[in-house]
């Protein structure tokens, strides 16, 4: 079994239990890829530098970070710091962990979005200067080689963003040449893309037990989603940050992952418990039925 684990970056999430579980899975002979976020660390670093983080709302109602050039520099610094810490933590657990970002080997690759559609004061606008991208390809060969050699990849944004460069900007010949630059992308969706590429089970760890029918009532935990009707109910229940996780779940399942689990990062054994039935389990059949 191959498992992709998304470790969140929220203040309320302690990764210690997840790292121990990764070590247990690797010892059992399972192949594991760890993907981490870090938005909280980015915001904390921006605050120390006296810079206000900027979030924008898309016309579809999704709220996301606007990443200008300065924020992108902070992003690379913060994610690099977190990646090193997680790799060291896993190595302390006896795991041969290797740190990667999405630019390495074009692990996560796709077009850069320099302009985004946003809603400000009720009006739709085009906001330029964004450093973000959409993942179109995952270098599964790179991950497969590392896994087959006994390594545990620890991956994170930024991704390799592609944009055309004209001849006047340094390319030869008449045809534009690709320019690759590091750009921001969502960590949940990065994990989803990797899980889809590897046909792996995806575990999305967060600071709650799973998806609740009533977001304010943990007793309403949705435990299993297998049909299109249950999928529709899941989408309706997911609010705020959880909506982004369900979007990632759909992308993973559509891409080839057999199952996605949304589970509590702060459980005693968060990954092992999730694989054993805790959290919200979404099967590929739910998305396949919904697409028919």
Residue ranges, per PLM feature:
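Glycine-rich active-site loop/strand segments that organize a redox cofactor
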Residues: 60-67
């Amino acid at each position: 079994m191959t498992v992709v684990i998304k470790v969140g970056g929220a203040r309320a999430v302690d990764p210690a239990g997840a790292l121990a579980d990764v070590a247990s899975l690797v010892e059992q002979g399972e192949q594991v890829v760890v993907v981490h976020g870090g938005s909280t660390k980015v915001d904390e670093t921006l605050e120390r530098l006296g810079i206000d983080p900027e979030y924008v709302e898309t016309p579809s109602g999704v709220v996301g970070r606007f990443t200008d050039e300065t924020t992108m520099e902070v992003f690379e610094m913060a994610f690099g710091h977190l990646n090193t810490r997680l790799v060291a933590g896993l190595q302390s657990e006896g795991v041969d962990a290797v740190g990667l970002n999405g630019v390495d080997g074009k692990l996560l690759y796709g077009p850069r979005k320099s302009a985004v559609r946003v809603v400000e004061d009720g009006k739709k606008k085009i906001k330029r200067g964004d450093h973000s991208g959409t993942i179109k390809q995952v270098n599964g060969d790179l991950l497969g080689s590392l896994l087959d050699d006994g390594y545990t990849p620890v991956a994170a944004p930024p991704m390799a963003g592609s944009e055309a460069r004209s001849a006047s900007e340094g390319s030869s010949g008449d045809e534009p040449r690709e320019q690759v630059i590091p750009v921001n992308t969502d960590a949940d969706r990065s994990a989803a893309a990797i899980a889809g590429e590897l046909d792996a089970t995806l575990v999305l760890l967060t600071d709650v037990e799973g998806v609740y029918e009533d977001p304010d009532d943990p007793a309403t935990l949705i435990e299993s989603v297998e049909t299109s009707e249950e999928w529709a109910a899941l989408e309706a229940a997911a609010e705020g940050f959880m909506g982004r996780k369900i979007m990632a779940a759909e992308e993973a399942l559509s891409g080839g992952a057999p199952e996605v689990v949304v589970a509590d990062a702060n459980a005693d054994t968060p990954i092992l418990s999730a694989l054993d039935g805790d959290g919200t389990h979404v099967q590929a059949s739910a998305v396949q039925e919904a697409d028919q």
